[in-house]
Amino acid sequence: MRHRKSGRQLNRNSSHRKAMFSNMASSLVRHEVIKTTLPKAKELRRVVEPLITLAKTDSVANRRLAFARTRDNEVVAKLFNELGPRFAARQGGYTRILKAGFRAGDKAPMAYIELVDRPAAEEAAE
């Protein structure tokens, strides 16, 4: 029985899921917008939002926790130096999911997941 088991399996084993979401979270923090399938985007929210909340309080312990989840020093630096201060006044809801139609090959529902309050220069570049 799967009572009280939260999260999607996404046809992957647990280590593959953990690695995939770690990589996707790093990409989202680095680029601030990524395109992926809708179910992956919805699950990615559950990984990224706690990371940003962690980054709002800068401490060595929090930096180590963030590094343990992302395994990328550049991403940890951006989280604590840019995103933490940017979202200091916001209590959650740091990401936005925009539906982007269906993929040509297999009709999988696609979506953009982005950080809210992105700088205007990045939006103009896209």
Curated annotation (Swiss-Prot):
GO terms for biological process: translation. SUPFAM superfamilies: Prokaryotic ribosomal protein L17. Keywords: Ribonucleoprotein, Ribosomal protein. The keyword Ribonucleoprotein applies. One of its GO terms (molecular function) is structural constituent of ribosome. Part of the 50S ribosomal subunit. Contacts protein L32. Belongs to the bacterial ribosomal protein bL17 family. This is Large ribosomal subunit protein bL17. The lineage of its organism: Bacteria, Pseudomonadati, Pseudomonadota, Gammaproteobacteria, Vibrionales. The gene is rplQ.
